[in-house]
């Protein structure tokens, strides 16, 4: 006797409410066939077959998928439109973050030349760049304060006005004082001063 006949015999012994809770739909093959009235009578006269319990993993998974619709509880189903809107918002957010990193990459030293900078590398480079700019500002403020207090006095030379005019286009600048000129800038400092060409 096949599973279909056994299922029909067992179904006839239980009420419909008991069947709903005790027998998950995955317990028997999905291709259950309808019995003709003659086959149903023959199956009802046959000896009831006991269901054998198996401890197979497939059976255990099947038992966990019981249908609880009879209790009036069902899991909330998300609407496809709501999911689509949420996914679209997330895509837009990621796009904006990526555009922000691309813009930042263009403003950090070596960022425009290095297209493969990761987000972490871009952030580290930006932090280093900001610290270097802050150090330059602090040094400039210290020199300005020294000029204002009279400790240092700038000497105006014919090259001074030329140096001031060329500062916007050139990353190298020099200051003149009574004691002489400053040491030339290192390549790293020149690279940091190059930011004026980006704006």
From Swiss-Prot:
Sample GO molecular function, one term: protein dimerization activity
GO biological process terms held by the UniProt record: nervous system development; neuron development; neuron differentiation; neuron fate commitment; neuron fate specification; positive regulation of neuron differentiation; positive regulation of transcription by RNA polymerase II; regulation of neurogenesis
Places the protein is found: Nucleus
Matching SMART domains: HLH
Region (Disordered): 37-56, 162-189
Ranges where the bHLH domain occurs: 81-133
Superkingdom, natural source: Eukaryota
Gene3D superfamilies registered for this protein in UniProt: Helix-loop-helix DNA-binding domain (4.10.280.10)
Recorded GO CC terms: RNA polymerase II transcription regulator complex
Biased composition (Polar residues): 162-179
Nucleus in keyword set: yes
Keyword set, alphabetical order: Activator, Developmental protein, Differentiation, DNA-binding, Neurogenesis, Nucleus, Transcription, Transcription regulation
Tissue expression as described in the entry: Neuronal precursor cells.
Pfam families the UniProt entry points to: HLH
Function: Transcription factor that plays a key role in neuronal differentiation: acts as a pioneer transcription factor, accessing closed chromatin to allow other factors to bind and activate neural pathways. Directly binds the E box motif (5'-CANNTG-3') on promoters and promotes transcription of neuronal genes. The combination of three transcription factors, ASCL1, POU3F2/BRN2 and MYT1L, is sufficient to reprogram fibroblasts and other somatic cells into induced neuronal (iN) cells in vitro.
Assembly description: Efficient DNA binding requires dimerization with another bHLH protein.
PANTHER family: ACHAETE-SCUTE FAMILY BHLH TRANSCRIPTION FACTOR 1, ACHAETE-SCUTE TRANSCRIPTION FACTOR-RELATED
Protein name per the record: Achaete-scute homolog 1
């Amino acid at each position: 006797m096949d599973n279909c006949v056994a299922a029909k015999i067992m179904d006839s012994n239980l009420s419909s409410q008991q069947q709903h809770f005790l027998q998950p739909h995955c317990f028997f093959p999905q291709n259950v066939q309808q019995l003709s009235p003659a086959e149903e009578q023959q199956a009802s006269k046959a000896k009831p077959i006991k269901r054998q319990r198996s401890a197979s993993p497939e059976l255990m998974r099947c038992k966990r998928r019981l249908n609880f619709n009879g209790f009036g509880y069902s899991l909330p189903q998300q609407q496809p439109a709501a999911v689509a809107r949420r996914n679209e918002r997330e895509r837009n957010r990621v796009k904006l973050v990526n555009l922000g990193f691309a813009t930042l990459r263009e403003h950090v030293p070596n960022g425009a030349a290095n297209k493969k900078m990761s987000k972490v590398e871009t952030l580290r480079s930006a932090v280093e760049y900001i610290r270097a700019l802050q150090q330059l500002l602090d040094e400039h403020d210290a020199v300005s304060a020294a000029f204002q207090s009279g400790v240092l006095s700038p000497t105006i030379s014919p090259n001074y006005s030329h140096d001031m005019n060329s500062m916007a286009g050139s990353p190298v600048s020099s200051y003149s004082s009574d004691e002489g000129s400053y040491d030339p800038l290192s390549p790293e400092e020149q690279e940091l001063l190059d930011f004026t060409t980006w704006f």
